[in-house]
Amino acid sequence: MLVVTLPDGSKREFEAPVRVADVAQSIGSGLAKAALGGIVDGKMVDTSFVIDKDSQLAIITDKSPEALEIVRHSTAHLLAYAVKELFPEAQVTIGPVIENGFYYDFSYHRPFTPDDLVALEKKMTELAKRDEPVTRTVMPRDEAVEFFKKQGENYKAELIASIPQGEDVSLYAEGKFTDLCRGPHVPSTGKLKVFKLMKLAGAYWRGDSKNEMLQRIYGTTWLRKEDQDAYLHMLEESEKRDHRRLGKQLDLFHFQEEAPGLIFWHPKGWSIWQEVEQYMRRVYQQEGYQEVKAPQILDRGLWEKSGHWENYKENMFTTESENRAYALKPMNCPGHVQIYNSGLHSYRELPLRFGEFGQCHRNEPSGALHGLMRVRGFTQDDGHIFCTEDQIQSEVAAFDKAVRAVYQDFGFTEVAVKLALRPAKRVGDDAIWDKAEEALRGALKASGQEWEELPGEGAFYGPKIEYHLKDSIGRTWQCGTIQVDFSMPARLGAEYVAENNSRKTPVMLHRAIVGSLERFIGILIENHTGNMPVWLAPTQAVVLNISGNSAAYAQQVQQLLKKQGFRIESDLRNEKITYKIREYALQKTPFLLIVGDKESESNTVAVRARGGVDLGVMPLDAFVARLQQDISQKVGPEPS
């Protein structure tokens, strides 16, 4: 008798091996119809999977968290099926699941067009409506190579040939189309109801620029139409908020070919930068950090000692001078250890906290560069804490408190915490990593935090806590980190004198709150759609005169406000006031101060807040009070 145990603890007995679909049918016809797959003893499988021993089983339906992966994987195959139907000469390559959807790469003699996407989506809908069964077969590797060669699918044959000899491979067929895949897949194409093809792109075969350029089709798939509609709406909002477009519209920064991945900051953009930097400098001071500055270029020998040369060389810019090899720093930590090592330290001095607005350079692939979000040159609010093992928890707890206060001030209230654990490529032995990971777990527990663990995602020198911010349209951004490092201080000879006069190696905590200032400013721009809070706005108010008669008073108002430390401009052009109002509204200026004869005579200003909100006529002192309040509270005015 074969026993299948269900998630609620109930058991089903069967006299012979049984398919997942049959177990679902034994529970109820509704569940059988809804089944998309199963989880047998922790492994995701098709509904056709045969259970031949006592097992635990969970049926995957559209209510299961695993459902989207199966549906998206199956939709990628549906796309490939449609391509082969409409373009029989196209060759299929790979089609993985990615965040929010999938892509599939094809080789074809001409570029696909937007019209082709429309036709392909229509064909996919037609194939889905046929509700053709999706069947799995297993084939020896060599037989599978010949199978795909006969079909003219040379890329698939090459992929399978790279699998070790003697291994079997699984194939999935729907209608006339067969593809290589580990699975699992939906039981039939009729389960695929909500999908959309999104865009076209190029991609090299196997990611190697020496190989053929393939055509990549991106798509998205969802279990419910309302989920897809929400996702598409979010994409529309993302387009409106694109910091690259807003950076140009608001005259904040630009990029050019002569400096790929590097930013030309304009006065208004640099004003935002300065506000963020000065704010973070105050955080350094409040949290007991000493600000330092380390060199940009360091000898190769130091990078070899730190482990960067072995583990990070491909991302470093290198140069030579007088027969010595150097590298532009990709990280600030080795420089801070040198500052620490310049003197002898006692245990009484620990924790010792250094902070730097450290400019780093990383040789990112050109295809990965993306505005302010992915650059080759960036500045971090980078701090390093030298402490004892006993001080780790209290330092991490203090950092956690500070990081949340900072995010609150910048307008982010939803913060998720993740713990990134040891990667495959790392320095230090497992005992050191065990100690480091447990130290961070203990600190999170002591802080009362909930967290998600990310195996393999840590830095090469230590595990890290990551802070992920949710923005105003629901996207998440990883910004702050704190990492425990038992390895680098020892590699670079850092020591302190312990209470018993012995020499010990300090623990080093790497921490950043906003991370890359460039990226964080890009996030701020998109979060606020360019409507920066008053305290960050490059121009906090503009004085607009209605006619030449009030020009002198407009200048007087501007000067009075500037003397009080506000960022104020005036526009005295001989243009219609409606034209000037519209122009500065497009610039997303927080306040417009309109002055004419009446305002000049009464020493007042007519105030319009962002979004066309009329705040009426008020004495200048009253406007100053409003401005000071908004700045101190780090708020509005919000666009209507």
From Swiss-Prot:
Domain of life: Bacteria
InterPro entries cross-referenced by the UniProt entry: aa-tRNA-synt_IIb (IPR002314), aa-tRNA-synth_II (IPR006195), aa-tRNA-synth_II/BPL/LPL (IPR045864), Anticodon-bd (IPR004154), Anticodon-bd_dom_sf (IPR036621), Beta-grasp_dom_sf (IPR012675), TGS (IPR004095), TGS-like (IPR012676)
Molecular function via GO: ATP binding; metal ion binding; threonine-tRNA ligase activity; tRNA binding
CDD domains per record: TGS_ThrRS, ThrRS_anticodon, ThrRS_core
Binding-site residues, Zn(2+): C333, H384, H510
Catalytic, as annotated region: 242-533
Domain (TGS): residue spans on this chain: 1-61
Coiled coil region boundaries: none
Catalyzed reactions per annotation: tRNA(Thr) + L-threonine + ATP = L-threonyl-tRNA(Thr) + AMP + diphosphate + H(+)
Compartment(s): Cytoplasm
Cofactor note: Binds 1 zinc ion per subunit.
Keywords: Aminoacyl-tRNA synthetase, ATP-binding, Cytoplasm, Ligase, Metal-binding, Nucleotide-binding, Protein biosynthesis, RNA-binding, tRNA-binding, Zinc
Family: Belongs to the class-II aminoacyl-tRNA synthetase family.
NCBIfam families reported for this sequence: thrS
Protein name, UniProt field: Threonine--tRNA ligase
Source species: Polynucleobacter necessarius subsp. necessarius (strain STIR1)
